[in-house]
Amino acid sequence: MTRSASASNGPGVVRSLTPFLDPLPIPPRRVIAEPTRLTVRLQTAMHQYHSGLPPSRVWTYDGHLPGPTIEVRRGVPVEVQWDNRLEGTLPVTVVRAPRFEVDGLPVQCAPGRSGGVPDADAAALPGFSVTHLHGGLTHATSDGWTENLALPGQSTLDTYPNDQRAAMLWYHDHVMGVTRFSVYAGLAGLWIVRDEREQELGLPEGPPYEVPLLLADRNFDVGSDGRLTGELLHKTDPEVMECFSPFTVVNGAIWPVVEVEPTTYRFRLRHGSNARTYRPVVPRDGEPDNQ
């Protein structure tokens, strides 16, 4: 494909989605005060990343993207039964596109396949799963080792002691060799551990003044009419395995907005992208404030 043939898939398509239009979603909370067993179901669902996009087929925890935020006090053990009810194959088109620029953008930062051919092996991936609590001090038997797979219709039971200092962790799928695809498909959520030392700081706890933010980037396929289809696209070039996608997603929404009051907020960020880096800033009078 020549550059001119692919120009319609460049910055103009990215700009077709209006930023700061949709409200910031807040994942549902599961607040745990005593030793508990939870059941979290892995499900295939439809999810709309932006009001200007058609819904996308995704993989989720409990039908939410991101999955429910689990909040627990330090030292309170939690058992989680991860119930795999995923249907169908991987809901992401995986391509490697020829190495060239699209209107000045690296090819993987432009929407659409850009001449890349879908990976047939990735397209056939079934919904195997194993969940890992990233950053958790967890026994090996519950750590979500990459080959301890549960097939659709099966479950795993893991124990999390939560005996560690306050932190915002995240849980995600961890299948050997394809973690990048299954997390891209939606299998991720937040896990908050609280302790007395954190409580002494007097920081906001819970909504609306504590705002968890799971950052990610996503790309989408483009139809013959030049419009985004909503189909998730994982595109790389032949020389770079890492994926850098053009749309920034926060809590499952592209470029969302949150209305705030003139008071203290606690914004908690978790980086959930494959490789992209971010430089979060707070604007003051229209300019970045790095103080």
Annotated model-derived regions:
Residues 1-291:
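Histidine-centered copper-binding motifs that mark active-site loops
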